[in-house]
């Protein structure tokens, strides 16, 4: 179905950092009568899933755009959608948050949860304090750089790492060179 093919190409163009293809597919969706709010939601998802921690402010841009689209409507919403989609397409990319939460969820689904360390547990009552809850907790802001040397993961998951950030590289000119070189090799 063309509807799904065009939205797929739109998302993949933002992911692939091609602002021109992003605009092409956005224009096709708008001319086909796609709901601008649907497009705005897809752009917000792309901001989190594709850009993520490489430029976390892009999510704020896309949320503001979605709100503006809902308030303003067409035809001016096209400009707001274009700005938000271009912000995603031209931003540095990282799917590290996406991968991190999926890895953590896979562990939880597999039953790898362990016990919350005693020093991290809540202790609002004398009874809970007598169990050792909260004892030995180090308040992060009392330590240099606000990083307290203590174990946060359950013993069963000690050393487990979920978050693996990417390097952010120079963007648009390099990408355009790569895209043009790739186009030439496919002809």
Regions found by a protein language model. Give the residues of each.
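Inter-lobe coupling/hinge segments of SF2-like helicase ATPases
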Residues: 1-7, 18
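Terminal-proximal interaction/regulatory segments of ATP-powered molecular machines
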Residues: 16-141, 145-147, 151-187
